[in-house]
């Protein structure tokens, strides 16, 4: 009933914009909720957008809106079916390639894994934070896990305008960083 994303994900823009789609059942829950909405009120946003001259709830970051528009143009040009297929193929390559390097996959089942990001447990004896720094020195950016996974997990993104040659280069840098 709620779908939420942000500009830096598959839309290929800088961070700073969030997008939410609210379904009918979710609207009913919002309207029934007794909790105060001091920071984010979907009701206030809806009424603002319904005006003859719609307004955003704050200052519009025009440069980010233009980035998102360009990302959407690129996605439309490639075709969503092809984009989804490309992301699934890259996800599978990252997973098979990293398993061969001794990494484990987080998420027990296929339905728990995203086609746009792979979360991995690092091999025994490898500190995720130090490993991320070594990978970065090879020109590739990966992220460490969050909270309790910070020292034992890395995250590899394969979304947006990433291609299979980028995935292969990432795997090569990750392999080199293990030695």
At which residue positions do the language-model features occur?
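Conserved active-site segment immediately N-terminal to the catalytic lysine
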Residues: 1-8
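Small/polar glycine-rich anion-binding or flexible loop at a beta-alpha turn
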Residues: 91, 111-117, 147-155
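Short beta-strand-to-loop capping motifs
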Residues: 22, 120-124, 158
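PLP-dependent enzyme catalytic core of the Aspartate aminotransferase-like
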Residues: 148, 152-179
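Active-site C-terminal subdomain of aminotransferase-like
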Residues: 11-96, 100
């Amino acid at each position: 009933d709620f779908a939420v994303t942000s500009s830096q994900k598959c839309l290929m823009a800088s961070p700073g914009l969030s997008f939410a789609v609210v379904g009918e059942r979710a609207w009913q829950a919002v309207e029934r909720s007794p909790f105060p909405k001091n920071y984010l009120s979907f009701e206030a946003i809806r009424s603002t957008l319904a005006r003859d001259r719609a307004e955003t709830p704050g200052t519009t970051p025009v440069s980010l809106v233009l980035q998102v528009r360009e990302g959407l143009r690129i996605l439309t040009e490639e075709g969503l079916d092809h984009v989804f297929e490309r992301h699934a193929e890259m996800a599978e390559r990252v997973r098979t390639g990293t398993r061969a390097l001794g990494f484990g996959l987080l998420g027990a089942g296929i339905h728990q894994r995203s086609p746009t990001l792979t979360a991995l447990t690092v091999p025994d004896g490898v500190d995720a934070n130090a490993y991320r720094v070594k990978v970065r020195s090879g020109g590739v950016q990966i992220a460490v896990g969050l909270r309790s996974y910070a020292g034992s997990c890395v995250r590899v993104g394969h979304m947006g305008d990433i291609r299979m040659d980028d995935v292969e280069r990432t795997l090569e840098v990750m392999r080199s960083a293990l030695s």
